[in-house]
Amino acid sequence: MPIRLYLIWGATTTGKTAQSVALARATGAPVISLDRVQCCHELAVGSGRPLPSELLGTRREYLCDRSVSSGVIPAADANQLLFDKVVRYSAHERALILEGGSVSLINAMIRDARWSALGEWALRRIVLPGRAVFIAQAIKRVRDMLEPPPGHASILDELEGLWAHPGNHAVLEDVDGYRQIIRYARASQVPIDRITSIDRSTMATLVERIAQEYWEHALWQEQEFLGIPATWRRADDA
């Protein structure tokens, strides 16, 4: 019997992780994140990696584990890693949940004919809401990233620690969230190694700018998505 592949996809900040956790609890299937930035464990907060407590006992894994200095994994390499993982899982799992994420990776999958012959697909696309709803969701997410509960790192902590290594700069400047913080720090002449000391007014400005950046990225993801091929075999209840 072919493995069932649940694909949950949609733009950034639309609730994919919550849906994948709910589906994993209902089916017992493991989740593989299709987010290429989440492969960098040092960017856990800024990339939206869920906390262990948020997984509610479900299984979740990432395509690989990379340092920021190695850069974000290219889409073609991510596609190959994912394909190999799915092949291995198909030997002992009845279903897998693929949660994405990276439109570049999903487009690489769409261009790869091998996916048409692997398993049955149950497709769940999350529709991008209107701007007002999206921005409200993004603001909550960004506030949580900037001001997490006590005992948890913030995106500012991540940036401050990583900035000490010049080899990380170009990568950080190319990732949503970190990019806006770096731009603001430079324009305001705030040293990155003191970024965790910003005041409430600056924090509010960063929330607005990062939320807007997420919205623009979400629109780009929607425009770039190629569409699921008709050759992908659908499961009966897809």
Curated annotation (Swiss-Prot):
- Judging by the UniProt lineage, the source's domain of life is Bacteria
From the record, what ranges are coiled-coil? none
User: Can you state which reaction this protein catalyses?
Assistant: dimethylallyl diphosphate + AMP = N(6)-(dimethylallyl)adenosine 5'-phosphate + diphosphate
Extract the SUPFAM superfamilies matched here: P-loop containing nucleoside triphosphate hydrolases (SSF52540)
Q: Which biological process terms from the Gene Ontology are attached to this UniProt entry?
A: cytokinin biosynthetic process
What EC number(s) has UniProt assigned to this enzyme? 2.5.1.27
Q: What class of enzyme is it?
A: transferase
Keywords attached to this Swiss-Prot or TrEMBL record, sorted alphabetically, are: Cytokinin biosynthesis, Transferase
Identify its protein family: Belongs to the isopentenyl transferase family.
Q: What does this protein do?
A: Transfers dimethylallyl groups to AMP as part of the biosynthesis of cytokinin phytohormones.
Tell me the protein's name: Adenylate dimethylallyltransferase
Species whose genome carries this gene: Ralstonia solanacearum
**Lineage summary:** Bacteria, Pseudomonadati, Pseudomonadota, Betaproteobacteria, Burkholderiales
The UniProt gene name for this protein comes to tzs
